Amino acid sequence: MKEVGKMYIIRKAMEYFKPKINRAYMNEVLKRLTENEKKIFLEMSDYDKFHSLEVYKKVRKTDLKNDEKYLKLALLHDCGKGNVSIVTRVLHKLGFKTELQNHAQKSFEKLEKVDEEVAILAKNHHNRGYSEEMGIFQKCDDES
């Protein structure tokens, strides 16, 4: 079982129940996406939209700030999670097997006909050692 700090779990629970999405910022960010990509993003749970916007903010502060595919990945990498409960999310974070284990593959399946390059990145966004760029992305994802 993974070691996860109490404060981390409390923060994530607060974000899950009351995600504070800045709608003006979200609308600005969505201009980067095609209509099909926007549709996928907007179908995500409020928590996953909030998380993705936080990852996007962090990616914008890295060497990937001008890399369109990684900026899109920040917004769409968790689109395969669906609307799962906080209990499932906590169990997954603690290392238990849950339906979230396959979310990267599900994200790939949702994105492959929309943007194959971003779909492949989404499929591999938890694979350590995939690429130097992915390592930068993973740090942003882990911190969000």
List each model region and its residues.
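Non-catalytic interface/linker regions that flank or bridge core catalytic/transmembrane domains
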Residues: 1-39
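Divalent metal-dependent catalytic cores for phosphoryl transfer on phosphate-bearing substrates
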Residues: 38-51, 57-144
